[in-house]
Amino acid sequence: VNTLQIGGMVKLAKRIIIGTAIFEGTGAIILSLRFIPQYGLFQGTWYGIFHSISAFCNAGFDLMGHTEQYSSLCSYAGDWVVIGTISTLIIIGGIGFIVWDDLYRKRWDFRHYLLHTKIVLVTTAVLLAGGTILFYLMERDNILVGMNGSQKFLACFFSAVTPRTAGFNNVDTAG
C-alpha cells in the first residue's frame, strides 16, 4: 500500500474492484460455458457464477452435492477447464490485493517487487510444487489408482491448491 494520501487509497480500491470483477467475471464465463450444456442455461450460469466467486474468495463452497452426497468437484476430477479455472481463481484470490497491485505497478519485474510480494509468490510456488509432488507420492497407490497421467497430475495439483480453502476437492479422500 505504502501511501499516505487518500487519492492513493482510492486508486487502489478501484483497482481491487476492477480486478475482482475481471477475475470473477472471467471465471464465471468459463465455468458457465462448461456447466450450461450439463445443467441448462439458468442452473449452469448460476453454478458458474457461484463457483467462480467461491473459488476466488477461497470459500470452498460448492453446489455439487446434488450429484451425490459430499461429492464436491469429484465428477470433474479430469476436467482441465473446471479444475484449472477454479485452481487459478483460488491462487489469484489467495495471493491478495497488495500483491496484485505490486504486480500491476511493477509490470512483472521481480527485482522491483515489494519483499511481501516476493515472499508470497515464492512461497505459493514452493507450496504448490511441493504439495503436488507429496500428494502424488503419498496417494499414487491409493486414490490415484485407475487415473491416467493427466488426471493424476490434475488431482494432485488441485489437492495442493485447495488446502487454503474451506472444502473443494476433486478426489474422494475418504476412500
Regions found by a protein language model. Give the residues of each.
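Membrane-proximal intracellular helices of multi-pass ion channels
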Residues: 1-175
